């Protein structure tokens, strides 16, 4: 047996039975195939251990194996480490893979998105930005406008985390240029939503409100409820900053929050955002009339956040 496709025809039992009889790169292929099947069953611990055995065999072969083979194994290790939340292993493995890939001209940018996520989780923001910029250049070479816009948007998110909205905004404006090339209305609106958020963070309220009016109109026409509520909330926050009637704004936010539907993760996250905003506004006023409601809302917020933690587990 010398063709990997033949391995895919074997049962798990046949693979394990024949494993002691094979050696070299073929043995690595056996471990890789067993790892792949474990991954498909969401048994990531077993899949990772099997992929690491496949890697160890290939590394012992040194020059007797191809870069493509070792890259395949490194990606498998990275995917399983990512599924297990082991960001350090993702980084150490895929950094090695990227060096080999660039050297061998086998560098597919989509293979390293989980490395960006790992850098972000470990707060290695500069490395994440550099990798995203590299991905952007790769996608730009093949005129993949969707991915170009996505890379630029991700870069902007990182700069926002670093409180560098002045750098984030030009990145988003460029992302918007690429999004418009796709002629995908929903994608264009998504990037414009990010632009509105950054304009708000930069306290450019008039420009932000002008854009919000357009977004609210578009989301109403398309009946995209979640985004519509978020944009209406942002507009109310601008009105709050302009010293409008604060109690009326709180009541308007409360009314909007009742329109959130669904129990999925996005709906829960949206409820958390609304509850936190209402609590912040009430605490800002410091009125005794909100004392009991504040206690209730803080309890509700804690329950929602606990639900998110349970979901993550």
Residue ranges and their predicted role:
Residues 8, 44, 87, 125, ...:
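TPR-repeat structural position
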Residues 25, 65-68, 106, 146, ...:
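Residue signature of alpha-solenoid helical repeat architecture, marking inter-repeat boundaries
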Residues 16, 55-62, 95-102, 133-144, ...:
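Amphipathic alpha-helical segments of tetratricopeptide repeats
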Residues 41, 77, 84, 122, ...:
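Structural motif corresponding to the intra-repeat A-B loop/turn of tetratricopeptide repeats
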Residues 1-14, 251-313:
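C-terminal non-catalytic interaction modules
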Residues 29, 68-72, 110, 150, ...:
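Residue register of alpha-helical TPR repeats
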């Amino acid at each position: 047996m010398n063709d990997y496709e033949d391995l895919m025809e074997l049962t798990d039992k046949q693979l394990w039975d024949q494993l002691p009889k094979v050696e070299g790169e073929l043995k690595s292929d056996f471990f890789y195939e067993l790892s792949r099947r474990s991954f498909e069953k969401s048994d990531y611990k077993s899949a990772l251990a099997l992929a690491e055995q496949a890697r160890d065999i290939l590394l012992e072969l040194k020059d007797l194996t191809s870069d493509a083979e070792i890259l395949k194994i490194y990606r498998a290790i990275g995917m399983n480490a990512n599924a297990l939340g082991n960001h350090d292993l993702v980084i150490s493995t895929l950094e090695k893979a990227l060096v080999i890939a660039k050297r061998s001209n086998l560098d597919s940018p989509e293979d390293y998105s989980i490395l960006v996520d790992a850098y972000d989780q470990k707060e290695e923001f500069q490395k994440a930005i550099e990798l995203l910029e590299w991905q952007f250049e790769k996608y730009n070479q093949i005129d993949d406008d969707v991915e170009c816009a996505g890379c630029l948007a991700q870069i902007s998110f990182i700069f926002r985390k670093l409180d560098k909205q002045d750098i984030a905004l030009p990145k988003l404006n460029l992302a918007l240029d690429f999004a418009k090339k796709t002629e995908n209305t929903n994608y264009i609106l998504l990037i414009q939503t990010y632009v509105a958020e950054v304009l708000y963070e930069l306290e450019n309220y008039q420009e932000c409100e002008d854009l919000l009016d357009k977004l609210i109109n578009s989301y109403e026409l398309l009946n995209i409820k979640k985004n519509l509520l978020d944009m209406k909330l942002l507009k109310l926050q601008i009105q709050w900053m302009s010293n409008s009637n604060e109690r009326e704004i709180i009541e308007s936010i409360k009314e909007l929050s009742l329109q959130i539907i669904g129990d999925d993760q996005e709906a829960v996250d949206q409820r958390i955002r609304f509850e936190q905003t209402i609590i912040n506004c009430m605490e800002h006023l410091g009125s005794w009339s909100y004392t009991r409601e504040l206690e209730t809302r803080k309890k509700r917020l804690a329950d929602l956040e606990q639900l998110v933690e349970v979901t993550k587990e």
